[in-house]
Amino acid sequence: MKKTLCIICLGLAGLAATASAATVELMPDIASITGQGYNSAGRLAGNGITAADVKNWLGPAGRADGWYTTTGNGDMKWGQASVNTANQSITLPNMNGTAGVCAGLKMTIENIQDYSGLSFSMNLTPSGTTGTYTYSVWYDTRDGEMVELCKGTRNNDGSPWNVHYDLTEDQLRAMKENGNGKVYAVVGSSGGRGGDNATVEDLSLEGTLAVPEPAAASLGLLGLAAMMLRRRRVRA
């Protein structure tokens, strides 16, 4: 009897363990980056970025999901951000003659209702000590409104910039209620000396996917344990 009850308890413990949350990487691999000019690109590369800028640059319905880049004056002749698919990184070059450079991602989150948490993270390593770096994350609503989730700016001091942001419960709830699944991330560099490049790595948008509680199995094992204890008392 004791051995059987012990097995039941171990089974319950195992079921409880399977109810833990799982983390899923939602951001797609960096496969390429496309030059895409914008007439107010100077704001995209800096802290003055607006919802309208993101919507007009990345949000058009005909624009496919993926990574895009532009310079601060919208002219690709000055150069652009580049990607390294082997180590999944993006290089932001500082170039004379332009207000800056940025890289932006348009992506889709499927089944957002299944997630109990979302978090954005990245690591930026500069090669010099000039310029300013920014990042921002946004989502699109079914009504066509672009909503900011987070934004940050840092004056370059030559040290790495490690970013991590967890969406609040209110933000995630609003995304589930109003979002259309489209999410955008923009990373920019402005005001730097020519040749002072930055490397952006470990770009991530993780979702916490809650595993449903195996309630039926748990109740069944609890019922069996209770029945065996009752039979034991009757025999005693």
Regions found by a protein language model. Name each.
Residues M146, R154-L209:
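Terminal, low-complexity interaction segments
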Residues A22-M95:
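N-terminal targeting leaders for non-cytosolic proteins
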Residues Q88-Q113:
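Short beta-strands within extracellular/lumenal beta-sheet-rich domains
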Residues I112-D114, T125-Y133, R193:
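Extended, low-complexity, turn-rich repeat/linker tracts enriched in Gly/Pro/Ser/Thr and Asp/Glu
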Residues A17-A21:
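Sec/Tat signal peptide C-region and signal peptidase I cleavage site
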Residues I8-L15:
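Bacterial N-terminal signal peptides
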Residues R232-A236:
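Short, charged juxtamembrane terminal tails flanking transmembrane helices
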Residues E213-R230:
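A short, hydrophobic C-terminal helix/tail in secreted or cell-surface proteins
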